[in-house]
Amino acid sequence: MSGRPGSALEGLPFGRTAQVARFEELMFGTVRLEELAEQARRETRKNFGKTMRLFAPLYLSNECVNTCQYCGFSKDNPIRRVTLQPAEVEAEARHLAGTGFRSVLLVSGEHPREVPVAYMAECVRRTVPLFPSVAIEVAPLEVDEYRQVVEAGAEGLVLYQESYDRAAYAEMHVSGPKRNFDERLLGPERGYAAGFRRIGVGVLIGLADWRKELVALAGHISHLMKVCWRAQVTLALPRLRPAAGGFQPRVAMSDRDFVRAVCAFRVAFPQVGIVLSTREPAKLRNGLMELGVTMMSAGSETEPGGYTGVGKARLHRTVRGREVALEAGEWERAEATEQFEISDDRSAKELSGALRQRGLDPVWKDWDRALTA
């Protein structure tokens, strides 16, 4: 690992706090990884006990109006697309609930016509009876739009900045509303104003210098902990995975540096939740179970209809945003295109077993709406 990053916070609306300085020292200083890992283990046990919250993503649509170089859903990719109907979303949700999940993340590409706010709210209403905890990961919205989703029953908002490097962000987001860096950056605060009780932010490793990205993420977290002080703040640092379009990471982050980053965030931000998705391999996820991670996904499908096959009859292909019918018979053997390839394909049951082997308790439900009714 090379030295400390330069001006990672330049041009961002938050500064270098004591917590950010602490993170930098842990991440780029002289402390040995083994020592840092032990500190992270102690802080995790102290603040979160022996628990691991489990959740599953549920994709609503892979339609998108943005052209993003790295994303499988990018408008320019000629992929198979579909937007699930609310009843189909409910069918996917019932399947996940039947496997034990009580926390779900509703995910969608950005397409105002195919995925309007009213549709999102209806999908939330369909899933709320099955899941005590419903979160959304969709395009940035305005406060009144977020409020509609909160009133429908959603309690969590996930909005990753992708990259905090303005130049890299502009290069990666070629066209579409996602090009607006600041609109996205301020989205979590608008979500908080609308009433979300859990706010998740993150950076996609592979788009720019990951050292600067991590410091900027630390700055964002420190800022949100002050301005969104009633909410639980969570973070994630997913690494790029293969996806339609074939984009290759601009910079790689080793497993050792990834582990160090998780541990450094845990020690510098002891009460912040850390999310680890199925992008990472099973062996690495196993190793991080006790070192700072507090939320894990399992058995994930990253395409709409991936759990039950619903919506298959309406599959179509798009070429630069224009809809093209599938070839005769193609839909019978095809599925919607996934956003990215997962690495850890273990089921929820298998992941629960791995957690218990390490003395950890899988938590399917950790909140109920009656607590705030």
List the predicted regions and their residue ranges.
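Short, small-residue-enriched loops and turns at beta-alpha junctions
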Residues: 62, 110-114, 205-210, 243-244, ...
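Catalytic cores of alpha/beta
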Residues: 142-151, 208-223, 281-291
